[in-house]
């Protein structure tokens, strides 16, 4: 790992005046840890592997230096000629993230007077409009792998002049099954290029990818930088009582907003209907919704018009809500990595957040796997009025133990599970 002295200001990172002016307008007061460590290396042309919590400011981490290098190319006349070429390619796993990243880049570039062209391409919308947007090429292309391959096969864009490749949320792209698409795209890129890889987790697939693609990269690992800002809690419930417990928590806590995760599209609709019968209005967000409807729901949630959103994992990435109070796992995610992606929607950028998982006895084994893979241990708790019925297998109700004991710790006494009065924020630090 690389040890870097953290600059105090964006000016010390070597950013140019138009970018500094825009950051001041956006009230970015100082670089986040990932920005402070990565931006100088990116400006120097180094390959980069970065692991950081969601909400750590990683979009600006790669967007700002890419914009600065493009501006320098324009000023010196080194910008690529006209044609269906792209200079900076950013690959992302979902259409929502593609749109969000492109919007952020355009926002950072407002003082460049339209000199830098940014285009986002993704599935679920007309390919013809995207082909039209790519006429004459583009400086920055933010794309999902599948749609990009479609556009390449239509000769709408070429990748042989790409200078920088950004793999944003690489673990998510691989977990969604984009391995073949990524391999096909990599084969079309020039050998000489800068590669920036960002990933919240580093499973074996991602490690292999970094070994194959990157050249002597700078490595930055900051996943644990703001762990203390996110409180994780686990509540045991009886089978069939999750909806009642969820409604109780929503009504009692009166959260400003809540993001609830389920594992299937039809579960979204079903849970929304059951909550509606209990007087709680919830919007749903999943892959069967058209792009315009999904955009409407996301915009409504971001502006606060929608208080409760029920979503599948398609929303676990690319959803950036300021000060989201709570994320609730109504169903446990299928993979330990997806657990981290889900809960990363709350407690972002130093804000205090809360992640709640509701588990019945059928979930216990899977949650232990999630804990083991993510090297966490969470106490099982119960909510007053919804105590768990006694079951024959006491080991199921036993809280999972740490995977390894510290030396000399000896045997640990098993603690009784708490029964609480749903004081969900117990243990959280005060927040404005």
Protein language model regions, located:
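Non-catalytic, charged low-complexity extensions flanking SF2 helicase motor domains
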Residues: 377-432
């Amino acid at each position: 790992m690389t040890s870097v002295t953290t600059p105090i200001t964006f000016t010390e990172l070597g950013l140019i005046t138009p970018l500094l002016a825009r950051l001041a307008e956006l009230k970015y007061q100082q670089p986040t840890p990932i920005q402070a460590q990565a931006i100088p290396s990116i400006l120097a042309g180094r390959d980069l592997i970065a692991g950081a919590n969601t909400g750590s400011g990683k979009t600006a981490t790669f967007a700002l230096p890419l914009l600065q290098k493009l501006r320098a190319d324009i000023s010196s006349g080194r910008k690529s000629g006209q044609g269906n070429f792209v200079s900076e390619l950013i690959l992302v796993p979902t259409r929502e993230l593609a749109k969000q990243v492109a919007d952020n880049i355009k926002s950072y570039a407002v003082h460049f007077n339209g000199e830098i062209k940014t285009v986002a391409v993704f599935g679920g919308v007309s390919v013809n409009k995207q082909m039209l947007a790519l006429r004459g090429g583009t400086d920055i292309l933010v794309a999902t792998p599948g749609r990009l391959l479609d556009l390449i096969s239509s000769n709408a864009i070429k990748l042989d002049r790409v200078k920088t490749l950004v793999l944003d949320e690489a673990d998510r792209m691989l977990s969604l099954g984009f391995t073949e698409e990524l391999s096909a795209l990599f084969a079309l890129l020039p050998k000489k290029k800068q590669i920036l890889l960002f990933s919240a987790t580093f499973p074996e697939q991602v490690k292999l990818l970094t070994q194959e693609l990157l050249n002597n990269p700078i490595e930055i690992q900051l996943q644990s930088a703001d762990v203390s800002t996110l409180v994780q809690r686990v509540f045991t419930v009886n089978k069939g009582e999750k909806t009642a417990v969820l409604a109780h928590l929503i009504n009692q806590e009166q959260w400003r907003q809540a993001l609830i995760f389920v594992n299937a599209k039809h579960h979204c609709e079903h849970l929304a209907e059951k909550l509606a019968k209990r007087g709680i209005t919830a919007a749903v967000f999943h892959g069967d919704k058209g792009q315009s409807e999904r955009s409407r729901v996301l915009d409504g949630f971001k502006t606060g018009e929608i208080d409760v959103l029920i979503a599948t994992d398609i929303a676990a990435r690319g959803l950036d809500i300021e000060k989201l109070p709570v994320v609730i796992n109504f169903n446990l995610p299928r993979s330990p990595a997806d657990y981290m992606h889900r809960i990363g929607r709350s407690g972002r950028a130093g804000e205090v957040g809360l992640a709640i998982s509701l588990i019945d006895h059928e979930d216990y084994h899977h949650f232990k796997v999630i804990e083991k893979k993510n090297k966490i241990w969470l106490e099982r708790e119960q909510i007053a009025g919804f105590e768990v019925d006694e079951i024959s297998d006491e080991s199921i109700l036993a809280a999972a133990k740490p995977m390894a004991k510290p030396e000399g710790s000896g045997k640990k006494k098993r603690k009784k599970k708490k029964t609480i009065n749903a004081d969900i924020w117990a243990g959280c630090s005060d927040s404005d």
